Amino acid sequence: MSKNIKEKIAFWIFRLLSLGVLLILFWILEFIFVRGWHMLSWDFFTKMPEDGMTKGGIYPAIIGTLYLVAGSMLVAFPLGVMAGIYIHEYTLDSFFKRFIKLMTNNLAGIPSIVFGLFGMALFVNYMEFGDSIVAGSLTLGLLALPVVIRVTEEALIAIDDSFRHGSYALGATKLQTVRKVILPMAMPNIITGLILSIGRVSGETAPILFTVAAYFLPKLPTSVFDQVMALPYHLYVISTSGTKVAESRDMAYGTALVLVLFVLILNLLANALRKYLGNKVKMN
C-alpha cells in the first residue's frame, strides 16, 4: 500500500471520528430541544415556580445563577489573571515555577464535589457565612481559578518576545511592559477564556449543593448572605428528588434547554468579543 493511500485512509478515519463527535453533540441538543422548546415563553423566564415546581417559571433560578456567576468571576478573574502574569512574566524557569504549574493543573483536576465540601467546611461553617451567595461565589471562584490561570498563561505565551524586547529597548520597566504592551495584546484570549469558564461555572451543581442552593424560595435574595435558587440545582431537584418528579418532567427539559442556550450564547459571545478585541489591538 502506497504512502498516499495510507494518508487518505488516515484522513478519512479522522474525518469520520470528527463527524461522530458532532453527531453525538447534535443528538444531545436535539434530544433536549425537542422536549424543552415548548416550555420557552415569557412566563417561563419571568414567573416564580408554582404547584410543586410543575408550573410557573424559573425566574429565581435564573437570577440566582447570574448572581453566582458574577460573584465567582469577581473572585477568579483578578486572582487568576495576576497569578498567570506572575507565573509567566516574573518567575524564572525553575523548580518553583514547575511546581506552581503542577499544583495548578492538579487543582483543575479536582472533582467539583470536593470543592463543594471544602467550601462548606471553610466558608459555610468555619467563616460562618452560612449557606449564602458569598459562600457559593467563593467556592465557584476557586473552582474557576485554575482555568483562568492557565488561560492567562497561554495568552501570554502566545505573545512574541520581540514585543517585550522592543519595550525594554525603549526604556520601559517590566511593569510598564506588562501593563502597556503585553496585557492589552493578550486580553482578547484572556477574556475569551474567562467567558468560557463562566459556562463551566454556571452548570456546576455539586459546589452550590453544599454552599448556597435552595430547593425553593418564595422571594428573590436581598443580601449576599441569603440563599438562592440556581438552574443546575433546580434541574437536579425536579428531575430526581422533587415531590412531583413525573409531573415536572417538562419543566426539567425546559430548564436544561435554558442552560444549554446560556452556554451556547456565551460561546458565541466569546468568539465575537475575541474578534472585536483582536481587531482593536491590531488597529492600535
Label each PLM-derived region with a short phrase.
Residues 1-18, 270-284:
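Transmembrane alpha-helical segments of polytopic membrane transport and secretion proteins
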Residues 3, 72-104, 117, 125, ...:
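Transmembrane-helix boundary motif in ABC transporter permease subunits
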Residues 52-56, 208-260:
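Interhelical loop and adjacent transmembrane-helix boundary motif
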Residues 56-86, 194:
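Transmembrane alpha-helix signature in integral membrane proteins
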Residues 73, 174-212:
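Transmembrane alpha-helices
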Residues 79, 92-96, 164-192:
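Amphipathic cytosolic juxtamembrane alpha-helices at the membrane-cytosol interface
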Residues 105-142:
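Generic hydrophobic transmembrane alpha-helix motif, especially the helices
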Residues 153-157, 161, 168, 195, ...:
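C-terminal transmembrane helix and the adjacent membrane-cytosol boundary/short C-terminal tail
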